[in-house]
């Protein structure tokens, strides 16, 4: 029994629930008493009377059993409640001597250093922006900072001692003009504990929302605190930065950046906060999302992902760009997304770029559509690790009468590798309803040994009047050995997008990247295929991309094959696209000193 744990508050709530169940059953039994125990015979004959008497007897027997069960239930609830009270009394009796003992332990350090040895810090009073009371030197969590009065910054959260979590920062006060900043989160315990969250920024009624408070840093072990959200206003306030994770932490990442504040009536949403760094060995925190834009306001940019640990760790993902919504005439522009964080020095992958914000169209006829935000750039890899992928471009919406469409955002470029690792893939271009879709992002450069990243596909043009996005170029394998990245495919649209060129191979060894295929054209020509990449000294040239087909116009031209250098075959040319007149096939690439020329593509 020495290992039995009881929570008196939970037991009391359970006893109350049991009593309510008994009351509900008692009310139901009382309601059924008359209809089930006093049945009238269906007729004046003996059989009907016997049947009614039989069922009434069953009802009376049920009521007798129910009365016995109700009595047992009441006794059980009474015993259960008494047990909960006994546990609570025992806990209170045991706690009283411990409180006295704790006072004895804390008194010397309180007198000498002004801080207790064990205990949580006191919270700051609301509406004062107060800093918090001191917590225990050995063990205890920092107190929460007090919220600010109108126009006053929130109080900082308290720092923990050796063991404990930092306190949350107080909320910034609202202002008639600009909102006040939120308080910073307190630092985590020196040995173990997470940083406190930053406080949210205050509302800026006619100006800019308050800045979100930065998250607190951890000590040796623990997660970084989350950055506070930016306050809403004409321009949204920026989100606070995430706190750094513990110096020797491996599992927990840096704190995420705070979300940018909302913007209204033509302003700009707040930028998301930067993710916290990853100490020595952990991952960086994600960047905060950009703030939402309302009534013609642009969405805020996403925050940059935090860098990975100094030695090892992946970069944090970039924050998503904020959505921009239109007013009666002008569509809102989506915010650009944040770049991915860089990896650590030795091992780790670069962070993925965030997604661009969506641009929503104007609600009135004749208005313009909203422009999507640009995708974020992927973070750079470590000495041993790949670059991060680029983010997807934001969606471009149309207006209410479908006349003026918004432009899709371009995909972000892939991050570069350093020593050994592949470049990150380029992000996909954003789609558009009636405007130009976004182009795909360029693939990242490979390391000294590593392949180039693939180019991102062009965005799709959804309706008539749209233009498909061009595919992104494949990344080069810029070092000694590695294949070039494949080019991204062109996007579908009334007018199609061209495919991206393949990346070039490394100096000594590797094949060139294949060119991307051209997109499908609905009313215009099919997109042209991308050119194949050049091979290294030993390797084949990349094949050209196929030309895109067209429903009513000419097929796209096939891309030419890439050339070989010393030993290897030239790449084959891409086939021409199908259409009212077929597209011309691409030329084959030139062979090296040893090898065959590439075949031309079919027309």
Curated annotation (Swiss-Prot):
InterPro entries: PE-PGRS_N, PGRS_rpt. Disulfide bonds: none annotated. Residues 309-333 are annotated as: Disordered. Residues 1-93 form the PE domain. Keywords: Repeat. Pfam families: PE, PGRS. Belongs to the mycobacterial PE family. PGRS subfamily. This is Uncharacterized PE-PGRS family protein PE_PGRS24. It comes from Mycobacterium tuberculosis (strain CDC 1551 / Oshkosh).
């Amino acid at each position: 029994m020495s290992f039995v744990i009881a929570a008196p508050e939970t037991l009391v709530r359970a006893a109350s629930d049991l009593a309510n169940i008994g009351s509900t059953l008692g009310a139901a039994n009382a309601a059924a008493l008359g209809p089930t125990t006093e049945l009238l015979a269906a007729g004046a004959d003996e059989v009907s009377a016997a049947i009614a008497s039989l069922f009434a007897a069953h009802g009376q027997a049920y009521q007798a059993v129910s009365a016995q069960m109700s009595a047992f239930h009441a006794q059980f609830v009474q015993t259960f409640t008494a047990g909960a009270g006994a546990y609570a009394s025992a806990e209170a009796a045991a706690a009283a001597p411990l409180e006295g003992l704790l006072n004895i332990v804390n008194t010397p350090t309180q007198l000498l250093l002004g801080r207790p040895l064990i205990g949580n810090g006191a919270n700051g009073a609301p509406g004062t922006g107060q800093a918090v009371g001191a917590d225990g030197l050995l063990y205890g969590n920092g107190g929460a900072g007090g919220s600010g009065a109108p126009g006053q910054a929130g109080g900082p959260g308290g720092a923990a001692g050796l063991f404990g979590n930092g306190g949350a920062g107080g909320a910034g006060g609202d202002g008639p003009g600009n909102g006040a900043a939120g308080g910073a989160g307190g630092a985590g315990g020196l040995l173990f504990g997470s940083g406190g969250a930053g406080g949210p920024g205050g509302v800026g009624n006619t100006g800019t929302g308050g800045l979100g408070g930065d998250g607190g840093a951890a000590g040796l072990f623990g997660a970084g605190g989350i950055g506070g959200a930016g306050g809403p206003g004409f321009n949204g306030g920026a989100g606070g930065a995430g706190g750094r994770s513990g110096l020797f932490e491996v599992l927990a990442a840096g704190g995420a950046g705070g979300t940018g504040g909302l913007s209204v009536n033509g302003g700009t949403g707040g930028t998301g906060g930067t993710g916290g760094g990853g100490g020595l060995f952990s991952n960086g925190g994600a960047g905060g999302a950009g703030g939402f834009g309302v009534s013609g306001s642009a969405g805020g940019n996403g925050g940059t992902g935090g860098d990975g640990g100094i030695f090892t760790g992946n970069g944090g993902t970039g924050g998503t760009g904020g959505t921009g919504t239109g007013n009666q005439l002008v569509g809102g522009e989506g915010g650009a997304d944040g770049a991915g964080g860089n990896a650590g020095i030795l091992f780790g992958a670069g962070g993925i770029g965030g997604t661009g914000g969506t641009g929503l169209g104007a609600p009135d006829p004749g208005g313009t559509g909203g422009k999507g935000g640009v995708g974020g750039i992927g973070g750079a890899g470590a000495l041993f690790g790949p670059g991060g992928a680029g983010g997807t471009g934001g969606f471009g919406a149309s207006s209410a009468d479908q006349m003026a469409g918004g432009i899709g955002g371009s995909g972000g470029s892939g991050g570069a590798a350093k020593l050994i690792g592949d470049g990150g893939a380029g992000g996909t271009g954003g789609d558009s309803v009636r405007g130009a879709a976004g182009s795909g992002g360029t693939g990242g450069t490979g390391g000294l040994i590593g392949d180039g990243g693939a180019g991102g596909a062009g965005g799709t043009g959804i309706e008539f009047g749209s233009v498909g996005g061009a595919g992104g170029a494949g990344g080069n394998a810029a070092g000694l050995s590695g294949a070039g990245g494949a080019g991204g495919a062109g996007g579908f649209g009334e007018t199609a997008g061209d495919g991206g060129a393949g990346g070039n191979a490394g100096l000594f060894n590797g094949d060139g990247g294949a060119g991307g295929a051209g997109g499908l054209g609905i009313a215009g020509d099919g997109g042209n295929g991308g050119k194949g990449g050049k091979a290294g000294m030993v390797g084949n040239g990349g094949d050209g991309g196929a030309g895109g087909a067209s429903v009513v116009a000419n097929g796209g031209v096939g891309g030419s094959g890439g050339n070989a250098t010393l030993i290897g075959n030239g790449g084959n040319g891409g086939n021409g696209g199908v259409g009212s007149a077929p597209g011309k096939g691409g030329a084959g690439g030139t062979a090296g000193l040893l090898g065959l020329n590439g075949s031309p593509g079919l027309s």
